[in-house]
Amino acid sequence: ILEQEELDALIGEGAEGLVTDSTDDVRGGGEKYDFASQEYAVSRLIPALSQVQSSLAEGIKQQMRQWVPSVDNIRADRIAVMKFAEVMRSTAAPAYIVSMRADPLGSPIYLAFEAELVFTLVDHFYGGRGRSQHVRAQDFSPSESRFMERLTESLMPAITAAWHTAVDINPVIDEHYHDFRFVDELQQSDTLMVTRFTVQIGTHEAELMSVVPWAADRKSTR
């Protein structure tokens, strides 16, 4: 769990990722913590976020079951630190991506559902067995998009509860995308903390992904 001083530095004014040897002129704790250092991230930020993502897996599972009772399990993989360019290359389009404003975090956070998961969820919801006829679609159908809009909106309380272990946020969906290339809030060189979740629905497995910008502290609203 991050200490209050660390949270203030991460999300508040003065969080510039700087390190100083003097603590007399530290304002809000921002200069005490080098958020950009790998050592700091491994020792503090990633463990805190790992707890968030473990809670998120359980919360999403419970909420998804309200829509698709055959969702058996969701398991979170280890957090991977990746450049946005890598995320774009490794995420096939279409994917159902939601950008969420998460005050008081200083930058959006994201959930991305791979196409196979979208097709399987929609097929089960409408009474099928998850045997989607889609091999590779250029985009989602209107009914698939409407279903995912409703599903992702219903996940907001689960996201709030999961983040409560680290910081209280109020997530609100800002945008929906079907391709990471159209996410204009991120630059290719931006560093992200990425967690993949494997969703088991009957005999099918598919993935969704949580994306948290590493540099949220440097993008905080002033």
Residue ranges and their predicted role:
Residues 1-222:
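N-terminal auxiliary interaction/assembly segments of multi-subunit proteins
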